[in-house]
Regions:
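Conserved redox-cofactor binding core of oxidoreductases
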Residues: 51
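Active-site core segments that coordinate phosphate-bearing ligands/cofactors
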Residues: 1-48, 57-84, 93-206
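Core-facing hydrophobic residues within beta-strands of well-ordered domains
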Residues: 88-89
């Protein structure tokens, strides 16, 4: 469910690198997070993970509601499977679901908000933009999101899974609940635009 190939941008290659090159850090780490899940934990103390993050970046099989232990053992991360995935997520929640607890006292104090303020489970940044297709005329099934930043992502939702070689996904409920997500993109889109602008004759005057 990753277009036939794992990208080095995904999290399991990063964890394998950490294990092979910084083993003491890998062994000591209590948890491994995607940024969105880290921010939820930092605000609430809740270790729950988002379907969006773990499905798109960590190989969680959302349509089967499980991790694939064989995959982790095959690539050399058997420790995570042996631990029943305690360090990468055992409670997986849909984006927008309130975390088990609201803001902690420390987080509330730091943000100037009431203790217990609800905090929703998050999404990967591009997917937070892509979910806007739900509000467009004719809805998510008829529109493709093109989200730009440092990278660029194209995302489209389908009612049934679509397997396309080289296209990430299909991911179930990773962006729009109940729909399958397929995505592609260009990691260096922002840098490419900067380079293009640098070629302009008036670039030094800008």
């Amino acid at each position: 469910y990753v277009g036939g190939k794992i990208s080095p941008e995904m999290e399991t290659p990063k964890l394998l690198w950490l294990k092979e090159h910084r083993r003491e850090i890998f062994d000591r780490a209590g948890q491994f997070f995607d940024l969105a899940d880290f921010l939820t934990w930092r605000a609430t103390g809740d270790l729950a993970r988002s379907i969006c993050t773990v499905t798109c970046k960590w190989t969680w099989l959302a349509h089967e509601n499980r991790w694939d232990a064989d995959y982790f053992r095959t690539i050399g991360l058997s420790e995570l499977a042996d631990e029943n995935f305690a360090r990468i997520g055992q409670r997986i929640l849909a984006p927008g679901t309130p975390s088990a607890s609201g803001l902690t006292e420390q987080a509330a104090r730091e943000m100037g908000l009431p203790v217990g303020t609800p905090v929703a489970v998050g999404l990967v940044d591009a997917h937070a933009g892509g979910i806007g297709t739900v509000g467009v005329e004719e809805g998510a099934l008829s529109n493709l999101a093109y989200v730009f930043g440092t990278s660029s992502c194209t995302m489209t939702s389908t009612a049934e899974p679509a397997f396309v070689p080289g296209v990430w996904g299909p991911y179930y409920s990773a962006m729009v609940p109940g729909l399958w997500l397929s995505e592609g993109g260009q990691s260096a889109a922002g840098a490419a635009i900067d380079q293009l602008l640098a070629f302009h004759p008036a670039a030094e005057e800008a």
